[in-house]
C-alpha cells in the first residue's frame, strides 16, 4: 500500500471518530436530561404546595397533565450528599388534571386566597428538542453521513478519472527553471563540451549569430554508450544558459490510446515556445524515433510512427526567433529514422565515447570530493585498471570502495579498497568457502601461470600485475592486467592477445597432457577476436573485405552477406589463426618450462602472486 492510500485511510477514520465523538456528546446530555427523576403526585398535594408558595414553576401540557418543580434552594438540601449528579437529578413532579376549566378556576381561587402569583405556562405540543432528535435519530444520521462520504469520494474519483481523460494528451515533461549543474561538474568529455558550449552561447546571445545571417541550431543529438554522461551534459547546458529546461523520456510519449503521443508532442512544443528561450531534452529518443517500416506489415506500430511524424513536423516547423533547442540522447543511433537525423532537425550530432585514461582520472577526482580518502592513493594506477568503464561505472566504484572501507572500519579509503572493489566488479565476489580439490587447484595454478608467462614475454600483450587462484564469481582463478590505451589495434597486437588467452590451456596440456573445461571463457573470447579479424577488419588471407553492418538493421535478416563457399573460407581462416597462436603459446611455454613449474608451485602455495613476485624470475 502506497503512502497516499495510507493517508486517505487515516483521514477517513479521523472523520469517523469525529462524528462518533459528536454523537456521544449529544447522547450523553440527552441521557442526563432523561434521567431526571419524575415523581407522580396528586392534585391535592399540588395545591397544598402552591398554598405554601413552594412551587417554582408549573407547565400545563396538552391540557391534560401538569409538570412542576419545587422552589427549594440549595441550602435546603443535604450538604453532605450534594454533588454534581445530585444537581443533575433535580426532582420533577407530574399529575393528571382531569377537567381543565375546573383546574383554572381553582388556580385563580388560590391566587386570591393566598395572594400568590405562580409562574406557569400552557404547552399544547410535545416537548421535543434538538437533543431528543439526536438521541432518537443520531445513530441513523451518522450512518447516512458515512455513506455520503463514501459516495462523495467515489464521485470525486470518477471526476478525477474523467479529468485524466482530458489531461492524457498533455505533456509529461518536467520543467526545471534553475539548474545548479554546470560544465565544471562534467569531468572529461572535453570535445563534446567544446562543441555544445556554442549552443549555450546561442541561447545567451542569439543576436550575435542572427545578425550575420546565421540560424540558431534546432537540435543536437548526443550519442554514446550508457552511463557516459549524455543526460548530465544536457543538464549542464541548461545550467550554464539558465533557461527553462524540459526533461522527459521517449517512452513518456507512448500511451495505449490512439493519438496521445502526437498530442503530447504538440503540447510540449507549445509550452516550450511560450517559455523560450528554452531547452527540450528527450532521453532515450529511440523509443519513438526508430526507423519507420517501409512495407505495410500487419501489427506494425502505427501509433509510434504517428508520434514520430508529429515530432518531425514540430522540429522542422520552428521559427528562427523561438530560441527553442532540442537535445536528445540515445545509445542506439543505428536504429533512428533517417528523417530525424537530417540537418534542419538535429543539426549537430555529438558522439560521446567511453572516457580515456586522463578522463577517468578527472571523473574519479569529481566523485572523490565527497569521500574521505588517503593522500597516498594512486589514482593513475586505479584508472589504468578500469579501461572501458563509463562515468556511471566509475561513480559506482568510488561509492563501493567507500562502503568497503567502512566495513573494514577504516578512517579513510585506500588504494587497496579501490582495487578490491574493481576485482569484485569485474570478477565477482570472492568465494572463500568453496572447496577445491588439490589436483584441481594445481591445474588452475598452472593455467593462470601460463597466461602470466606469455603476457610477460610477447611484445604486444597487456602487462600482467597479479595472478590468483582464489575463486571469484564464476571463475576459479584470474590473471589481472594493466591494459594499454589504444585507439587502433594492429594485426600483431590482436594475435598476441589471442596467444595470451591460449596460454592457460597450453600450460595445462604441457603439464598434464590433457585439456579441461576451465578455458571456456578464454575460448569464447579468442573465437570472437578471430572472427572480428576475418569478417570485420580484413586481417586474413580472405583479403581486404568486411562483412560488418554498422547500421545494425540487418541483424534479424535471414540472408547472409556472403556465399556458402565464403562462409567455409571464413571458418578455415578463423581456425587457422587460433591454431597458429596455440602452437606459438606451446613453444613459448616449452622454452620457459622451468619457470612455469617454479611459478605455478609458488602460486599453488601462496594463492596470490604480484608483479614483484615473478618479475625477477621472468626477466
Swiss-Prot record:
The regions listed as transmembrane in this protein's record are 12-32, 132-152
Q: Where is the signal peptide?
A: none
SUPFAM superfamilies with a match to the protein in the record: FtsH protease domain-like (SSF140990), P-loop containing nucleoside triphosphate hydrolases (SSF52540)
Which residues point to the Cytoplasmic side?
A: 1-11, 153-619
Which stretches are Periplasmic in the membrane topology?
A: 33-131
- Binding note for cofactor: Binds 1 zinc ion per subunit.
| Amino acids binding Zn(2+) | 447, 451, 522
Q: What is this protein called?
A: ATP-dependent zinc metalloprotease FtsH
Q: Which organism is it from?
A: Karelsulcia muelleri (strain DMIN)
Q: Which gene encodes it?
A: ftsH
